[in-house]
């Protein structure tokens, strides 16, 4: 389940913004949270221009980058008010009581420039520009260069090549993402 998303210089958010999708101390709708405190679903309500769609697009972006057949224009997510040509997105999930953190950064001139994947603070994927190292199947790390594309998540490449067969938590995470739905 998605616990948190952090957007930096992304669409209408010039500054770093974190949205926590965990329950509060209010008793209203207390059954809307899983045992780990993460919301089972949520609705964003607010004034026009307050960032509701930006948050939803940030969430949807990961699913699109992993599973869409189309190549997305990554430059279209840069904040028009920001001074930097970089933006970043970080996701935190709770799967089987383990924390998965996945982040990527985009330079709108170079496309994807970094990706990081952690499982309970253990690095499993580290990408910088056109080289990447994966610790998913090999604890010593496997180096990749030719498989790294400027406009595709390396996480996607690893998933489609291995299906994360050696890691049931990552497999369940991807299945969760495939089954996710959003309405805008």
Question: What are the residue ranges of the model-derived segments?
Answer:
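Pre-Walker A-like glycine/lysine-rich segment at the N-terminus of P-loop NTPase domains
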Residues: 1-60
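Intrinsically disordered, low-complexity boundary segments flanking structured domains
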Residues: 4-8, 78, 139-144
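Short polybasic amphipathic segments
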Residues: 5, 87-92, 111-119
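Short strand-coil-strand connectors
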Residues: 8-11, 94-98, 120
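Short, mixed charged/polar active-site loops
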Residues: 14-16, 97-101, 123
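Conserved P-loop NTP-binding catalytic core
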Residues: 37-43, 47, 56-109
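Electropositive, glycine-dotted interaction segments
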Residues: 101-184
